């Protein structure tokens, strides 16, 4: 028995020495080569809301992307990662071939368009000319309604046309201008295309065809002549007749009239195809169009291709003091006088109107900050910047500024709530404070308005291990559990268990060694393997 024990100890020592020379691989924690890049986050989720909840809990700047699966009927899984991390793998073009940006609900975004028509049903249509005329019309409308000047050089024009279908994406790169969210962008698009919608409605007196995408839009098909005239007068432009937008009316494969512009892409958490991605089952990817006139700014640290990629992202909008956020309501001519939201119910007219932000608890906290010193302030409007998880509140009736130690006489202030860093601070619209780039001292947020507290009731934890999510960085070699009886194991059973564990350890070492050799020649992990691992988890 002693001899057998000594032999076993010697065997253990030999194996320990072996593992010291060739240790088992630790859990892979990918990180980009540049030291300044943040730690890698790369997680997959079956459900979109879980992906967004995970993003909100992260201190890092991460985003949600949708990956189209080859299995199932249009099934998608959701990837959470940073722009830099995604581009690192995306640029190889060997994986992640069918990717979509998920445009977050309520988030400030760029103006964008999805254009398409059936070539066989429209043999005389000149797609390039139609795109050029549309850009010209949109630029003119932006100047008329908002006094925003732009041209074709500010429009990223992407093409994924085939022999059967003309298809384009337009993403406007407005200088220091963005829309409050994609719903407001959609309202603006519908408003400026009213003459074209009217032409379609004349062909079908009963209602606008479903292909036009007018369900629940809040717009009548009658052109908004009065509002357009008012907008022109506001910016000092002469009145004019409705523009001829007949070039936007095309026919679908059934021969029915429809709009060249897809009005269905301005919905909640819309999936919008990424630059250089293709639809599943299709071989044509979204590339820079031949007639594209937009050129991104040159940068020493970012390649031109990466710049194009970042420019194509609709929700890639960062907060700045000079950023102007545009709004467009479904029917501003029928808009009621809005109440300035405050705890006392004091009613004042709000130019933009106010509804609660995605975080009503934060709204109430901000109201508590501006209701003091016998002054009853309120929230004039808010804007949500998803990349930074930043809420920017324009305050009304409360003008106290930390920079000057008193209230401004006429200029209003802003309260900014940084949910990722759990702080709030004050800035203001006063020209002198803006010139100084003034920002007040950061103050911590109360626990009850921290993101972790706000998300506590969600079906989510930061370390998910259930069937609804998985991570590419998660260790897949989970050791089996051992069922021990209350009285322990017998000597024979101990020998069997020990041998089994030794065998398992040996197999693990051999597996790790084989994996190193097999993966050494691979540039990346195929899409099929990623999706199969997720579905089998």
From Swiss-Prot:
Kindly list the positions annotated as binding substrate: 76, 114-116, 165-169, 270-273, 279
Q: Which cofactor does it need?
A: Mn(2+)
- Protein location: Nucleus; Mitochondrion matrix; Chromosome
Q: How is the cofactor bound?
A: Can act both with Mn(2+) and Mg(2+) as cofactor in vitro, but Mn(2+) is the preferred cofactor in vivo. The polymerase activity incorporates correct dNTPs with much higher efficiency with Mn(2+) than with Mg(2+). The fidelity is slightly more accurate when Mg(2+) is the cofactor compared to Mn(2+). In the presence of Mn(2+), a conformational transition step from non-productive to productive PRIMPOL:DNA complexes limits the enzymatic turnover, whereas in the presence of Mg(2+), the chemical step becomes rate limiting.
- According to the record, the residues making up region (Interaction with RPA1) are 462-536
Quaternary structure, from the entry: Interacts with RPA1; leading to recruitment to chromatin and stimulate DNA primase activity. Interacts with SSBP1. Interacts with POLDIP2; leading to enhance DNA polymerase activity.
Q: What is its EC number?
A: 2.7.7.102, 2.7.7.7
Organism annotation? Mus musculus
Where is the motif RPA1-binding motif 2 annotated in this sequence? 524-532
Nucleotidyltransferase found in the keyword field = yes
The residue stretches assigned to a coiled coil in this entry are: 1-22
Q: What the protein does? A: DNA primase and DNA polymerase required to tolerate replication-stalling lesions by bypassing them. Required to facilitate mitochondrial and nuclear replication fork progression by initiating de novo DNA synthesis using dNTPs and acting as an error-prone DNA polymerase able to bypass certain DNA lesions. Shows a high capacity to tolerate DNA damage lesions such as 8oxoG and abasic sites in DNA.
User: Which segments carry the region annotation Disordered?
Assistant: 462-481
| Cellular compartments per GO CC | DNA-directed RNA polymerase complex; mitochondrial matrix; nucleus; replication fork
Q: Which family does it belong to?
A: Belongs to the eukaryotic-type primase small subunit family.
Which terms in the Gene Ontology molecular function aspect does this entry carry?
chromatin binding; DNA-directed DNA polymerase activity; DNA-directed RNA polymerase activity; manganese ion binding; zinc ion binding
Name by which UniProt lists this protein: DNA-directed primase/polymerase protein
| Signal sequence coordinates | none
Residue positions annotated to bind Zn(2+) are 401, 408, 428, 433
Q: Where is the composition biased (Low complexity)?
A: 468-478
Domain remark text: The zinc knuckle motif binds zinc and is required for the DNA primase activity. It facilitates the binding and selection of the 5'-nucleotide of the newly synthesized primer and the recognition of preferred initiation sites. The RPA1-binding motifs (RBM) mediate interaction with RPA1 and are essential for recruitment to chromatin. The interaction is primarily mediated by RPA1-binding motif 1, which binds to the basic cleft of RPA1, with motif 2 plays a supporting role in RPA1-binding.
Q: What class of enzyme is it?
A: transferase
Ordered alphabetically, the record's keywords are: Chromosome, Coiled coil, DNA damage, DNA repair, DNA-directed DNA polymerase, DNA-directed RNA polymerase, Manganese, Metal-binding, Mitochondrion, Nucleotidyltransferase, Nucleus, Transcription, Transferase, Zinc
